Amino acid sequence: MKKAYKFRMYPNKKQQELINKTFGCCRFVYNKYLAKRIEVYKNNKETFTYKQCSSDLTNLKKELNWLKEPDKFSLQNALKDLENAYEKFFKEKTGFPKFKSKKTNRFSYKTNFTNGNIMYCGQHIKLPKLGMVKISDKQVPKGRILNATISKEPSGRYYVSLCCTDVDIEAFENTNN
Protein backbone atom coordinates (compact mmCIF):
# COMPACT_ATOMS: atom_id res chain seq x y z
CA MET A 1 0.00 0.00 0.00
CA LYS A 2 1.21 3.54 -0.75
CA LYS A 3 0.88 6.53 1.55
CA ALA A 4 1.88 10.18 1.19
CA TYR A 5 3.29 12.42 3.91
CA LYS A 6 3.26 16.19 3.42
CA PHE A 7 5.67 18.46 5.31
CA ARG A 8 6.07 22.23 5.37
CA MET A 9 9.61 23.16 4.30
CA TYR A 10 11.71 26.10 5.40
CA PRO A 11 14.47 26.37 2.77
CA ASN A 12 17.18 29.00 3.11
CA LYS A 13 17.68 31.66 0.38
CA LYS A 14 20.12 29.55 -1.64
CA GLN A 15 17.79 26.53 -1.52
CA GLN A 16 14.78 28.69 -2.48
CA GLU A 17 16.72 29.99 -5.47
CA LEU A 18 17.57 26.45 -6.61
CA ILE A 19 13.97 25.27 -6.10
CA ASN A 20 12.66 28.19 -8.18
CA LYS A 21 15.25 27.49 -10.91
CA THR A 22 14.15 23.86 -10.95
CA PHE A 23 10.51 24.92 -11.39
CA GLY A 24 11.57 27.06 -14.35
CA CYS A 25 13.75 24.35 -15.90
CA CYS A 26 10.97 21.76 -15.63
CA ARG A 27 8.53 24.18 -17.27
CA PHE A 28 11.08 24.92 -20.03
CA VAL A 29 11.69 21.21 -20.73
CA TYR A 30 7.95 20.41 -20.75
CA ASN A 31 7.14 23.30 -23.12
CA LYS A 32 10.13 22.68 -25.40
CA TYR A 33 9.28 19.03 -25.94
CA LEU A 34 5.56 19.71 -26.27
CA ALA A 35 6.39 22.16 -29.07
CA LYS A 36 8.83 19.65 -30.59
CA ARG A 37 6.24 16.86 -30.53
CA ILE A 38 3.69 19.12 -32.22
CA GLU A 39 6.24 20.19 -34.86
CA VAL A 40 7.41 16.63 -35.61
CA TYR A 41 3.81 15.45 -35.97
CA LYS A 42 2.89 18.35 -38.30
CA ASN A 43 5.94 17.84 -40.52
CA ASN A 44 6.29 14.05 -40.61
CA LYS A 45 3.01 12.69 -39.21
CA GLU A 46 5.15 10.75 -36.70
CA THR A 47 5.20 10.81 -32.93
CA PHE A 48 8.21 11.94 -30.91
CA THR A 49 8.34 9.35 -28.10
CA TYR A 50 9.47 9.71 -24.48
CA LYS A 51 12.64 7.77 -25.28
CA GLN A 52 13.50 10.16 -28.11
CA CYS A 53 12.74 13.17 -25.89
CA SER A 54 14.94 11.75 -23.13
CA SER A 55 17.95 11.20 -25.41
CA ASP A 56 17.43 14.64 -26.95
CA LEU A 57 17.35 16.17 -23.45
CA THR A 58 20.82 14.73 -22.80
CA ASN A 59 22.11 16.57 -25.89
CA LEU A 60 20.25 19.74 -24.89
CA LYS A 61 21.95 19.67 -21.47
CA LYS A 62 25.32 19.76 -23.24
CA GLU A 63 24.26 22.92 -25.12
CA LEU A 64 22.50 24.70 -22.24
CA ASN A 65 24.64 24.54 -19.10
CA TRP A 66 21.90 25.98 -16.87
CA LEU A 67 19.90 22.77 -17.38
CA LYS A 68 22.61 20.95 -15.39
CA GLU A 69 21.82 22.94 -12.22
CA PRO A 70 18.55 21.25 -11.21
CA ASP A 71 18.08 17.65 -10.18
CA LYS A 72 18.21 15.34 -13.22
CA PHE A 73 15.18 13.34 -12.08
CA SER A 74 13.01 16.47 -12.04
CA LEU A 75 13.64 17.05 -15.76
CA GLN A 76 13.01 13.40 -16.61
CA ASN A 77 9.77 13.52 -14.63
CA ALA A 78 8.70 16.61 -16.60
CA LEU A 79 9.09 14.50 -19.76
CA LYS A 80 7.14 11.65 -18.13
CA ASP A 81 4.36 14.12 -17.25
CA LEU A 82 4.24 15.17 -20.90
CA GLU A 83 4.10 11.52 -22.00
CA ASN A 84 1.26 10.85 -19.53
CA ALA A 85 -0.63 13.91 -20.82
CA TYR A 86 -0.35 12.55 -24.38
CA GLU A 87 -1.47 9.07 -23.31
CA LYS A 88 -4.50 10.51 -21.52
CA PHE A 89 -5.33 12.61 -24.58
CA PHE A 90 -5.42 9.57 -26.85
CA LYS A 91 -6.87 6.99 -24.44
CA GLU A 92 -9.24 8.93 -22.21
CA LYS A 93 -10.14 11.68 -24.68
CA THR A 94 -9.13 14.48 -22.31
CA GLY A 95 -7.94 17.80 -23.69
CA PHE A 96 -4.73 18.21 -25.68
CA PRO A 97 -1.68 18.94 -23.46
CA LYS A 98 -1.27 22.66 -22.77
CA PHE A 99 1.89 24.71 -22.44
CA LYS A 100 2.88 25.54 -18.86
CA SER A 101 2.81 29.21 -17.90
CA LYS A 102 5.09 31.29 -15.67
CA LYS A 103 2.08 33.18 -14.43
CA THR A 104 0.47 30.32 -12.52
CA ASN A 105 0.62 30.52 -8.75
CA ARG A 106 1.39 26.86 -8.12
CA PHE A 107 4.67 25.22 -9.01
CA SER A 108 5.89 21.70 -8.34
CA TYR A 109 8.40 19.12 -9.43
CA LYS A 110 8.93 15.47 -8.59
CA THR A 111 12.21 13.72 -7.90
CA ASN A 112 12.86 9.99 -7.54
CA PHE A 113 14.51 8.09 -4.69
CA THR A 114 17.84 6.54 -5.69
CA ASN A 115 20.76 5.44 -3.50
CA GLY A 116 19.53 7.26 -0.40
CA ASN A 117 19.24 10.70 -2.02
CA ILE A 118 15.94 11.38 -0.18
CA MET A 119 16.07 10.83 3.57
CA TYR A 120 13.94 11.86 6.56
CA CYS A 121 16.16 13.04 9.43
CA GLY A 122 13.92 14.25 12.27
CA GLN A 123 13.46 18.02 11.81
CA HIS A 124 15.22 17.97 8.42
CA ILE A 125 14.83 16.18 5.13
CA LYS A 126 17.64 15.43 2.71
CA LEU A 127 16.74 16.17 -0.92
CA PRO A 128 18.83 15.86 -4.11
CA LYS A 129 20.87 18.99 -4.96
CA LEU A 130 19.24 20.88 -2.04
CA GLY A 131 20.88 19.00 0.80
CA MET A 132 19.31 19.20 4.27
CA VAL A 133 16.14 21.32 4.39
CA LYS A 134 14.34 22.18 7.65
CA ILE A 135 10.78 20.87 7.93
CA SER A 136 8.04 21.18 10.52
CA ASP A 137 5.86 18.24 11.39
CA LYS A 138 5.82 15.57 14.02
CA GLN A 139 4.74 12.65 11.84
CA VAL A 140 7.41 10.14 10.87
CA PRO A 141 7.14 8.56 7.42
CA LYS A 142 6.89 4.78 7.50
CA GLY A 143 7.86 2.39 4.74
CA ARG A 144 10.19 2.84 1.79
CA ILE A 145 10.33 6.27 0.10
CA LEU A 146 9.53 6.15 -3.63
CA ASN A 147 9.67 9.83 -4.58
CA ALA A 148 9.33 13.38 -3.31
CA THR A 149 7.26 16.21 -4.76
CA ILE A 150 8.45 19.71 -3.93
CA SER A 151 5.76 22.37 -4.30
CA LYS A 152 5.25 26.09 -3.75
CA GLU A 153 1.85 27.50 -2.78
CA PRO A 154 0.55 30.90 -3.95
CA SER A 155 1.27 32.21 -0.44
CA GLY A 156 4.98 31.48 -0.97
CA ARG A 157 5.10 28.48 1.37
CA TYR A 158 7.14 25.47 0.33
CA TYR A 159 6.07 21.86 0.90
CA VAL A 160 7.52 18.42 0.29
CA SER A 161 5.35 15.34 -0.14
CA LEU A 162 6.94 11.94 0.32
CA CYS A 163 5.30 8.97 -1.39
CA CYS A 164 6.06 5.82 0.61
CA THR A 165 5.28 2.19 -0.15
CA ASP A 166 5.06 -0.93 2.04
CA VAL A 167 2.99 0.98 4.62
CA ASP A 168 0.48 -0.89 6.77
CA ILE A 169 -2.77 1.07 6.86
CA GLU A 170 -5.37 0.16 9.46
CA ALA A 171 -8.74 -0.86 8.06
CA PHE A 172 -11.81 0.91 9.42
CA GLU A 173 -14.45 -1.03 11.29
CA ASN A 174 -17.57 -1.84 9.32
CA THR A 175 -20.46 0.14 10.85
CA ASN A 176 -23.13 -1.55 8.71
CA ASN A 177 -24.56 1.83 7.69
Regions flagged by a language model, labelled:
Residues M1-N177:
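Nucleic-acid substrate recognition interfaces
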